[in-house]
């Protein structure tokens, strides 16, 4: 599961009011095969910290089974940042699919 999958799953759970799913998704750290990412807090600015980057949710909205996510990505290896907006759909089973990305 990529960091963005994790974020959209979190937002989908929050938007649908599924408290159990939120508790399951949010933990002190999430172990991946090659690295550890941290999920910091359940507040509006969800931050994910990787070994050489940081991503922070700036804004998000849920409407008509669509999740709109605006986030900022800081890449420490290339020393740059970019703002990205992603649009995702949530089907009745809770599966989230990416529709479009703007950067």
For the regions a protein language model found, what residue spans apply to each?
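C-terminal and inter-domain tail/linker signature
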Residues: 1-103
């Amino acid at each position: 599961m990529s960091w963005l999958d994790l974020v959209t799953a979190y937002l989908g759970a929050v938007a649908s009011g599924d408290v159990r799913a939120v508790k399951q998704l949010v933990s002190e750290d999430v172990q991946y095969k090659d690295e550890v990412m941290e999920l910091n807090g359940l507040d509006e600015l969800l931050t994910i910290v990787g070994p050489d980057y940081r991503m922070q949710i700036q804004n998000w909205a849920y409407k008509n089974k669509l999740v709109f996510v605006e986030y900022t990505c800081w890449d420490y290896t290339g020393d740059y940042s970019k703002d990205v907006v992603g649009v995702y759909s949530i089907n009745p089973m809770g599966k989230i699919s990416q529709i479009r990305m703007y950067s």
